[in-house]
């Protein structure tokens, strides 16, 4: 790792599997915060990961000296983080789903936007 403050994995869980990452400094985030340019892509997988895949991801994160993996998503993403944490990886999940169905949370990012869109369509 090139002394980066942040390492981004494009494509969500598939990006972690493909080991597709980019290093970024905090200063870069300031630049992106004033533009509408996306700096990372999302992704999903519809299949259950094998233990060997979790081991591979954990090994990659440890080799990059990642202190914590932060992931935003729904139930599947949070279940993924829960399992990955069993491989001694510090994980932090941010509930982000229009369903607002993340256990233990009263609110998720995306829910209010979905409600607003529905109200606009109805009225």
Please annotate each region the language model reported:
Residues 2-7, 85-108, 117-119:
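Short, acidic/small-residue loops that bind anionic groups at enzyme active sites
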Residues 1, 24, 57, 84-87:
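Short, solvent-exposed amphipathic alpha-helical segments in soluble enzyme
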Residues 19-20, 82, 104:
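Short, well-ordered secondary-structure micro-motifs
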Residues 1-17:
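N-terminal phosphate-binding or glycine-rich loops at protein starts, especially the Walker A/P-loop
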Residues 11, 24-27, 35, 93, ...:
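Residue-level signal for pocket-adjacent positions within structured domains
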Residues 16-71, 76-77, 109-123:
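Glycine-rich oxoanion-binding loops at beta->alpha junctions
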Residues 13-16, 78, 97-102:
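Short gly/pro/ser/thr-enriched loop/turn and capping motifs at secondary-structure boundaries
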Residues 9-10, 41, 71-73, 92-93, ...:
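Short beta-strand segments
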